[in-house]
Design a protein with these regions (language model features):
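Post-transcriptional modification and biogenesis factors for structured RNAs
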Residues: 1-164
């Protein structure tokens, strides 16, 4: 019987816990925080991207519920943590970087990523970007330079570019 899960051939027929444990041994030194305060658009895509680029963990700030269909099963292999209150957004041992096209942000293509520090990339809501409470936890900000007429990328796309 064929394994119908959306996993690479290497992981076909492995148990879910075994896949997650194997990935945990290979993860990179960054995590992702995505806001789920108002809408859950693109959360599934962000989780899939976190899996593709081996993020250490994914923090979902706000509501616990989101449409898991968008993850195509990737949420099963990730270290997901739901943070419901602003007080939980404390990461003293990490370097927190907001991803948004705001005035003080630095261009991602020339940005010098912190060396030897655990980085948390913070992504806001699809329609409003980073809220003031999320901006308050960030040490600095980066943006993705664009050349067309639209002002922003969707969060799923921006997270893939940033994690890559």
């Amino acid at each position: 019987m064929d394994d119908p899960r959306n996993v690479i051939d290497y992981y076909k027929y492995w148990k879910t816990d075994a896949i997650k444990a194997d990935l945990d041994q290979k993860r990179h030194n960054f995590s992702v925080l995505i806001s789920n305060k108002f809408t859950d658009f693109n959360i599934g895509s962000v989780i899939r991207n976190a899996n593709a680029f081996l993020a250490r963990e994914v923090f979902i700030y706000g509501r616990r519920q989101f449409d898991r269909r968008g993850t195509v099963g990737a949420h099963l292999y990730e270290n997901l943590k739901v943070l419901r209150e602003i007080e939980e957004l404390s990461f003293p041992d990490s370097y927190v970087i907001g991803v948004d096209n705001i005035g003080e942000a630095k261009a991602i293509e020339t940005y010098e990523w912190p060396k030897d520090k655990h980085v948390i990339m913070v992504f806001g809501q699809e329609d409003i970007g980073l809220t003031d409470e999320l901006k308050a936890i960030c040490k600095e900000f980066i943006y993705i330079k664009q050349y067309g007429s639209v002002r922003s990328l969707n969060v799923g796309c921006a997270s893939a570019i940033t994690m890559f």
